[in-house]
């Protein structure tokens, strides 16, 4: 195997992503950011088709898979995730949104906030994305500046509605396509956006002192070397030689030793919270580990089947259910990176839960999940998100 380039950590690292309604220009903006930063030698310019390249979407022209792009500003190193915009593929938004320290919300000035704008803001809030910066795109297509003011007000109100500081959120107006085409004014706006991202989205306090935990997103085999699990480190640190446990979905916990570590296809000495890494595991067969399990410091997390959760159930207008549900309702609970069916039991005195309600209830899962108090989840049925919440109590 060829010797890999070594990843050197010099600037603080931040995970961000683009969110917003389909066709509002998320991927075009991602391409524009890399193109503008490439002129300063801080990125490799990625064109739209490179970022948009996921096999399933070719026939349909909708972003399905999550693209990771890396670039730098003068101050920081960024991993940028392009979140899918289409409601059918909200599942990737959920695995993706969990990977963001902050987000750039893209809203087309020609349209204003649309249903998925709202859904992405809600999901960002529920999966703990605490800082959002707004890019009003396609401003070159709106003649009347008062109309753009109106769209900006609507976006600020919407952010406030979901608990973001709508009045203080920075809003940058521009045109991603114009910037991509080389328009100087438009490129200045992209620079302004990145300055705002540098300043407004705080460098995350990495949870490096907590025990290591990494939800497994993907598993593959390197011939002659063994099995690799990849994902974003949730907390703690990991290095070659560490013992780890593979926890979740089955009762039995498997123990292994880390024999290799990579980030951005470069070898890494130490992986820390927030890093997207590949972990090479000793003595683990490809079929002994699956997406949805976690790698964890030995003894730090256990599997559970029953818990209480504080949950927000989406209203009909947010794309949620149209009808209430009762005890014994059996949707899917999306933990870390996988769906597990669970049966809901409503608390005494609550006969039913209406779309739009905030509530707490008990859940019994059909498979054990690696969860603890504070673990976030979404509730899904038939491929759509109907609720989101977090674990408030473990009951088994």
From Swiss-Prot:
Membrane-spanning ranges: none
Binding, GTP: 20-27, 82-86, 137-140
A family per Pfam: GTP_EFTU_D3
Region called G1, residue ranges: 20-27
Cystine connections: none
Keyword terms of this UniProt record: Cytoplasm, Elongation factor, GTP-binding, Hydrolase, Magnesium, Metal-binding, Nucleotide-binding, Protein biosynthesis
Gene3D superfamilies in alphabetical order: P-loop containing nucleotide triphosphate hydrolases, Translation factors
Compartments where located: Cytoplasm
Superkingdom of this protein's organism: Bacteria
EC number: 3.6.5.3
UniProt keyword Ribonucleoprotein, yes or no: no
Region (G3): 82-85
Chief location: cytoplasm
PROSITE patterns: G_TR_1 (PS00301), G_TR_2 (PS51722)
Annotated stretches, region: G5: 175-177
Domain tr-type G, first and last residues per copy: 11-205
Cellular-component GO terms for this entry: cytosol
Catalysed reaction equations from the record: GTP + H2O = GDP + phosphate + H(+)
Protein residues bound to Mg(2+): 27
GO molecular function, one term: GTPase activity
UniProt keyword annotation of Oxidoreductase present: no
Subunit structure: Monomer.
Task of the protein: GTP hydrolase that promotes the GTP-dependent binding of aminoacyl-tRNA to the A-site of ribosomes during protein biosynthesis.
Family (UniProt): Belongs to the TRAFAC class translation factor GTPase superfamily. Classic translation factor GTPase family. EF-Tu/EF-1A subfamily.
Name the UniProt record assigns to this protein: Elongation factor Tu
Gene (UniProt): tuf
